Swiss-Prot record:
One of its GO terms (biological process) is L-phenylalanine biosynthetic process. The active site is at residue 92. This is Phenylalanine dehydrogenase. The gene is pdh. L-phenylalanine binds at residues 80, 275.
Amino acid sequence: MILVTLEQTLQDDKASVLDKMVEHEQILFCHDKATGLQAIIAVHDTTMGPALGGCRMAPYKTMDLALKDVLRLSKGMTYKCAAADVDFGGGKSVIIGDPLKDKTPEKFRAFGQFIESLNGRFYTGTDMGTTLEDFVHAMKETNYIVGKPVEYGGGGDSSIPTALGVFYGIKATNQNLFGDDKVEGRKYSIQGLGKVGYKVAEHIINEGGNVIVTDINEQAIADIQKLGGSAVRVVSSEEIYSQQADVFVPCAFGGVINDDTLKVLKVRGISGSANNQLAESRHGELLREKGILYAPDYIVNGGGLIQVADELYGTNPARVLAKTENIYTSLLEVFHQAEQDHMTTATAADRMCEKRIADAKNRNSFFTQSNRPKWNFHQ
């Protein structure tokens, strides 16, 4: 089996939970006996602004696994916010329970009360296992919800800017590999035709590229074949890794760059929307040794985050698209730094983000409502 499960990844994590906890500014354990709510909110860093991160609901087998997951994800959001250059820090929340059986309106209202108790230090929204409908209930108790539908004052479908950011990531990867960023005439293997992956395939086809696709959704496959005709080839979920293509575009699962897939990959670059594509950090070095250019996922998939962050300043689609375009230049900066300093692109991306956070410390060391930073929209 090529994919590594989330539970196995968390169990294999040998780092001390206590060490991970002390990296964070604040951790809130939420328990409401009346509704059965058990949740954890982790605020990793608010140097650049209030913490921002989605809320997952999953049937974690132990509290320890839930804590490990929320600590890992909240730290990742700090880097993702820095990469997207939005004035927010990193946070995350998890609700312990089966999203198919354990949801109630009362439970999400109770969760909203815990969010409200943080007084704006943490904003959250949907993630794996939660929906917009869930947060309609939470919004009755708190104003600190983002990623709302248009009818509730939000920016709408975040997969649109996310897919656009992935497309800019592909073009930046092409620029570094081939000396030009054109999509036409090149081949892209796309894993997953969900809300984001399908739109990425559309962008590629519309600009004259060829796609090799895989997905379990037969309707999505039929639709993309109808759109692209001979520019589309369909393969199985296992075959997608061994396709001869210019760029691999993972838009489904995490952990897809691992010991098994590295043996069969036949691409020049990787740029996709899936989170945590490297099963382990050492796989970034193995990609470098194989001469495969990796566009760090948390930069590439930042378009949705940019839209969500924009909601808090008054939704402006033109501003979102302009800021999403910066993903292209950020990746070129990362690629250049990695080449210059003989390091992996993942390490170069982390260093870029750490510098942005360090620079922000000169202006703002800890977020409160009274010192909320403002975007400079003219940059």
